[in-house]
Amino acid sequence: MGRTLESKKQIVEEIKGLLDKADMALVLDYQGLSIKEMSDLRSRLEQSSGICKVTKNTLMRKAINGDATWSGLESLLNGTNAFVLVKGDVGSALKAVQAFQKETKKSETKGGLYEGKLLTQDEIKAIAALPSKEALMAQIAGALNSITTKIAVGVNEIPSGLARSLKQHAENSES
């Protein structure tokens, strides 16, 4: 027995709510994945601020209809799709999906959408290869710390150099 019109409307509203909170959407071909494997993917995504939603393409089409941010997904809505919606740390969620795909060798990323731009598989891999936000902040902090250290050494070196020059000049004057 199929879903009622009311339950379909609820699903569309739920998807709209999830999309409103999401920063990125990935479309995966999940054909051939077992329930256990889908559960594994979902648990990996929970740890990295992502959610995996399996729904009919027609319901997703209704959810993105009229929404300029997500309308680019329209071209990916064919076949058996699972939708990964990511809020926050996009890189860690992409790494979780890629690690899952590498282990199972059953799922394939069709594409994605980030900030209204349709992404290819290569672009998604490039984003996943970027360091996490925490790693970037640590690199910036390290760079700033080294700059301040160099400035402090340089500022300290000026009076020391002057003192050495004066001492040498005084020794030369005495001779």
Swiss-Prot record:
What CDD domains does its record include? Ribosomal_L10
This protein's record includes keyword Ribosomal protein: yes
Under Gene Ontology molecular function, one entry of this record is: large ribosomal subunit rRNA binding
Q: Which UniProt keywords apply?
A: Ribonucleoprotein, Ribosomal protein, RNA-binding, rRNA-binding
Q: What GO CC annotations are associated with the protein? A: ribonucleoprotein complex; ribosome
Regarding protein family, the annotation reads:
Belongs to the universal ribosomal protein uL10 family.
- Relate the assembly described in the record: Part of the ribosomal stalk of the 50S ribosomal subunit. The N-terminus interacts with L11 and the large rRNA to form the base of the stalk. The C-terminus forms an elongated spine to which L12 dimers bind in a sequential fashion forming a multimeric L10(L12)X complex.
Which PANTHER family does this chain map to?
Answer: 39S RIBOSOMAL PROTEIN L10, MITOCHONDRIAL
Function in brief: Forms part of the ribosomal stalk, playing a central role in the interaction of the ribosome with GTP-bound translation factors.
Q: List the protein's name.
A: Large ribosomal subunit protein uL10
